[in-house]
């Protein structure tokens, strides 16, 4: 029980004002551990948007204690998709991937939090829905490897590149109070 309490407490850990940029390293106390507050790109793909899964995805990230700092729905331009998937250009499925990703709207989001890159990868599950564990987004909602509902950055460096590709800095919010402000409760 104690371990569960501390894991929950760490998930909701809020740091002071953010420095510019998608990643921030914060040290708590002298000689204490390092806590990395990061940003990552998460995109609900056209099949997820069409199946109205955006709310379920947002709910999972919010329950995990992450802070939404940017979100938009768009018909992804082929130029953005080509740059986003540049590492897959030589793969035989690349043309079909670009057609699929441009077949309908995508909901792109930037989430911020403690180790959010690694945590989001665990939350979305294996790329192949047949191998994705139940309880993961793909394990619960994906029906085929080519229609796997969601994308999440696979590294801090990849997240930085992808966020800059999909968002302008003016489209991202910096929570001055660490995301703890509530409009329902007076300050």
Swiss-Prot record:
<keyword id="KW-0547">Nucleotide-binding</keyword>
<feature type="transit peptide" description="Mitochondrion">
    <location>
        <begin position="1"/>
        <end position="28"/>
    </location>
</feature>
<keyword id="KW-0446">Lipid-binding</keyword>
<dbReference type="GO" id="GO:0006183">
    <property type="term" value="P:GTP biosynthetic process"/>
</dbReference>
<feature type="active site" description="Pros-phosphohistidine intermediate">
    <location>
        <position position="151"/>
    </location>
</feature>
<comment type="function">
    <text>Major role in the synthesis of nucleoside triphosphates other than ATP. The ATP gamma phosphate is transferred to the NDP beta phosphate via a ping-pong mechanism, using a phosphorylated active-site intermediate. Through the catalyzed exchange of gamma-phosphate between di- and triphosphonucleosides participates in regulation of intracellular nucleotide homeostasis. Binds to anionic phospholipids, predominantly to cardiolipin; the binding inhibits its phosphotransfer activity.</text>
</comment>
<dbReference type="GO" id="GO:0006228">
    <property type="term" value="P:UTP biosynthetic process"/>
</dbReference>
<keyword id="KW-0809">Transit peptide</keyword>
<feature type="binding site">
    <location>
        <position position="138"/>
    </location>
    <ligand>
        <name>ATP</name>
    </ligand>
</feature>
<feature type="binding site">
    <location>
        <position position="93"/>
    </location>
    <ligand>
        <name>ATP</name>
    </ligand>
</feature>
<feature type="binding site">
    <location>
        <position position="127"/>
    </location>
    <ligand>
        <name>ATP</name>
    </ligand>
</feature>
<dbReference type="GO" id="GO:0046872">
    <property type="term" value="F:metal ion binding"/>
</dbReference>
<dbReference type="GO" id="GO:1901612">
    <property type="term" value="F:cardiolipin binding"/>
</dbReference>
<dbReference type="Pfam" id="PF00334">
    <property type="entry name" value="NDK"/>
</dbReference>
<keyword id="KW-0546">Nucleotide metabolism</keyword>
<dbReference type="GO" id="GO:0005759">
    <property type="term" value="C:mitochondrial matrix"/>
</dbReference>
<dbReference type="GO" id="GO:0044877">
    <property type="term" value="F:protein-containing complex binding"/>
</dbReference>
<dbReference type="GO" id="GO:0005524">
    <property type="term" value="F:ATP binding"/>
</dbReference>
<dbReference type="GO" id="GO:0005758">
    <property type="term" value="C:mitochondrial intermembrane space"/>
</dbReference>
<comment type="subunit">
    <text>Homohexamer. Interacts with OPA1. Interacts with CAPN8.</text>
</comment>
<keyword id="KW-0496">Mitochondrion</keyword>
<feature type="binding site">
    <location>
        <position position="45"/>
    </location>
    <ligand>
        <name>ATP</name>
    </ligand>
</feature>
<dbReference type="GO" id="GO:0006241">
    <property type="term" value="P:CTP biosynthetic process"/>
</dbReference>
<keyword id="KW-0067">ATP-binding</keyword>
<comment type="similarity">
    <text>Belongs to the NDK family.</text>
</comment>
<dbReference type="InterPro" id="IPR023005">
    <property type="entry name" value="Nucleoside_diP_kinase_AS"/>
</dbReference>
<keyword id="KW-0808">Transferase</keyword>
<dbReference type="GO" id="GO:0005739">
    <property type="term" value="C:mitochondrion"/>
</dbReference>
<dbReference type="GO" id="GO:0006869">
    <property type="term" value="P:lipid transport"/>
</dbReference>
<dbReference type="InterPro" id="IPR001564">
    <property type="entry name" value="Nucleoside_diP_kinase"/>
</dbReference>
<keyword id="KW-0460">Magnesium</keyword>
<dbReference type="GO" id="GO:0009116">
    <property type="term" value="P:nucleoside metabolic process"/>
</dbReference>
<keyword id="KW-0479">Metal-binding</keyword>
<dbReference type="GO" id="GO:0005743">
    <property type="term" value="C:mitochondrial inner membrane"/>
</dbReference>
<dbReference type="InterPro" id="IPR036850">
    <property type="entry name" value="NDK-like_dom_sf"/>
</dbReference>
<feature type="binding site">
    <location>
        <position position="121"/>
    </location>
    <ligand>
        <name>ATP</name>
    </ligand>
</feature>
<dbReference type="GO" id="GO:0004550">
    <property type="term" value="F:nucleoside diphosphate kinase activity"/>
</dbReference>
<keyword id="KW-0472">Membrane</keyword>
<keyword id="KW-0418">Kinase</keyword>
<dbReference type="GO" id="GO:0051020">
    <property type="term" value="F:GTPase binding"/>
</dbReference>
<feature type="binding site">
    <location>
        <position position="148"/>
    </location>
    <ligand>
        <name>ATP</name>
    </ligand>
</feature>
<protein>
    <recommendedName>
        <fullName>Nucleoside diphosphate kinase, mitochondrial</fullName>
        <ecNumber>2.7.4.6</ecNumber>
    </recommendedName>
</protein>
